[in-house]
Amino acid sequence: MEEIYEKYVFRTVRKGEAETAVAIETACFPPNEACVLPIMKQRVKMAPELFIVAEEKNTGKMIGFVNAIATDENSLRDEFFTDIRLHNPQGKYIMILSVAVLSEYRHQGLAKEMMRQLLNRQKEAGRLAAVLTCLDSKVEMYKKMGYVDLGISQSSWGGEEWHEMICHLQNME
């Protein structure tokens, strides 16, 4: 894991990086699932502390990110993806809205490290849990990050069938 820090920097998103985040999101997700620029700009503006970026040290290029909003709800619904007004900075739960890493940078542990950093920060902030939805093919990956599969989600974002997963932050090591 140490070598990941030799190549990459992990940090909070900066103002003006929404366009780059949308380009990454568009490369990683089909059009029916990807976030659009006006909404990404709102996420960057309203919840930057819940937006972790991976950047190449040598080039300064953003290569991936994890973003979320906070709420007092404990289940992810489709409206969280499009309505930033649902973000409650004091919320006890975070809803992970996107985990995206450019394809040429995958399988190095970047998503896991961005998630680890976000979850540790939110645990320290007193939040109870993180919730996400994922396709069946990603369930095992998220289990390795400490998530528990709750079964099929109420979310039908993008017309897909999703698994809802939760990570209880106070149980994290």
PLM regions and their residue ranges:
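Conserved acyl-donor/pantetheine-binding loop and adjacent beta-alpha core of acyl/acetyltransferases
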Residues: 59-100, 106, 156-163
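Cytosolic beta-strand hydrophobic patch enriched in CBS
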Residues: 51-56
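Helix-loop element at the rim of GNAT/NAT acetyltransferase active sites that forms part
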Residues: 23-36, 43
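Conserved acetyl-CoA-binding loop-helix of GNAT-fold acetyltransferases
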Residues: 101, 107-120
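Conserved acetyl-CoA-binding loop of GNAT-fold acetyltransferases
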Residues: 143-153
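Conserved GNAT acetyl-CoA-binding A-motif
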Residues: 115, 120-135
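C-terminal "cap" of GNAT-fold acetyltransferases
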Residues: 135-136, 154-173
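A short beta-loop-alpha structural element at the N-terminal edge
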Residues: 7-21
